[in-house]
Amino acid sequence: MSNQAAKLAKFLLEIKAVKLSPSEPFTWTSGILSPIYCDNRMVLSYPEVRTFVAEELAQLIQREFPEATRIAGIATAGIAHGALAADKLNMPYCYVRPEPKKHGLKNQVEGEMNPGDKIVLVEDLISTGKSSFQAVEGVQNAGAEVIGIVALFTYGFANAMEKFVNAGIPVHTLTNLPTLTKVAAEYGFIQDNELATVNRFAENPSAWGESL
């Protein structure tokens, strides 16, 4: 657990971007029932946290993907974080929808993206990886190459991470669920029984929901 990962985890807990509800689980877009919900949009409302995230994402992109020619946010929650990071790096920016619009220009990529561009996608969080792969497909359809994905947070689900490995797409995040739970326990944001519930969920998300 790096100092910066722990710092962001504490920020997310302090601004209540992370919500716990073991007795009344959240239903994700994917249909997964979860005792935890991470709303990284909250980061945008807090200047100190917003600046920290933008700087950390920019440094992460610069360190891991120096060959990148363009940053692309993943709609919708990754749009703002991607734009802020691209601004720090003074790099071209666009964003990618899950699918082409049904009207107007019917774009999936909004903004300029050129064939041959080396793209780093910016996501707010990674759970099942579905939205990330939809964006990857959109970039590839535009004739560009996804060289990596960065995100604020990952649940670290094994199935999702395996998909990225198999696709040959490196993924780097600023913090993750194990760090978050450790920091939450250390600073009293979470009770022992809640911690045990989150840990069981992380081990097997589908089985946890089915056991309710």
List each model region and its residues:
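PRPP-associated nucleotide enzymes
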Residues: 1-122, 130-212
